[in-house]
Amino acid sequence: MTRLFSWAAALSVVSVFSVSQVSAYVGEVHNYTRRATTGNGWDIDGKSFDYVIVGGGTAGLVLANRLSADGSNSVAVIEAGPSGYEDNDKFIVPSAMLYDSAVNTQYDWQYKTTSQKHLNGKEKSWPRGKVLGGSSAINGLYYVRPSREEADAWAELAGKNGWNHWGWDNLLNGMKKSEKLQTPLKSVREQAHIEYDGSSHGRNGPIHTTWPAVTYGPVGAFIESASKVAVPRVKDAYGGENHGTYVALSSMNKRNWQRSFSRNEYLDPISDRNNLQVLTGHLVTQVIFDRSDKNHVQATGVHYKASVDEVEHTVHANKEVILCAGAINTPQILQLSGIGSSDLLNRHGIDVVVDLPGVGENLQDHISFGLSFRVKNDKDVAPQQITGNKKTDSYVNSAVSYVNFESLF
């Protein structure tokens, strides 16, 4: 039986509902005092914003920043998890992801996959960030890109206008716009055998990328061994060909050796914008629709709660409701709001707003696994703990080999 919480299509991470097609319309702008992230659901209850963004994660905070930039639009963001400020080191210290991880804590949705036939029926953990910054706050800091073939496949799937917005060339421009590449330290570059092409990277974006301030012998040894035995080294893994062995960039700021993610790069610098309100600790339960015109259903707001037993709140959208709740929660909210397979919705007693069978189906994620081995000299490996030294604690193991799994079978 298909479950209401079934996996989402990978391309449905961000869904946008247009409320007004009148370009001259100017929505109401709330003149708040200095904006602060709040956990009080009453602070936005009953109010109207031009844009209501559901999910303060990797994509949601980027949109909040850009939509509120010129001051003419009011923006509300609703994040299910906490702000994370009270546990800041868990997010900003890179090696914390190895020794003090936010995975399997309150900052993680702690999802598990369904039983996997080719893993002897096992269910596997699938971490998803439940905090401001989303998965960009709790991941392993790997900064990698898809291959040209994958990006171009998205354009094909998007239909006749897909090449106007998707495809490798368009996506590369966007990826470079968001990136600020910082060169590796000479000692690290030599020891880890780091190779890259600067022309494939951005230099002025909010997200800082670089390599850790320290590295260790096994990293360079892995690059040499894997490239000779199995997967050849790739010299420009960010230019459209990522199949190969290389040391991946980390989303890290070389100035302070801290994680660079959507919260501290897109939200924190704009904390004084009075047209932006961020609510944490509240789940959106349903999108509200105006169905007066059966041929043009419009989203006009959302309902949200602090928990199942708490009071339900409502916030209204003048222009758009934007779902940025991730690959699982975005389609879940759509289904709970009546958008999805009519057969599934009817079985669960949900009023069908739009019969759209693809919602919540066909998600496939990449497979990854690590290699473990003993070393003869334990002085040539990371210290296995957070040390308090910023350079030492910047270490994350980012030596990778990407292969086309279809070629293995």
Question: Which role fits each region the language model picked out?
Answer:
Residues R3-F409:
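N-terminal redox-cofactor-binding region of secreted/periplasmic oxidoreductases
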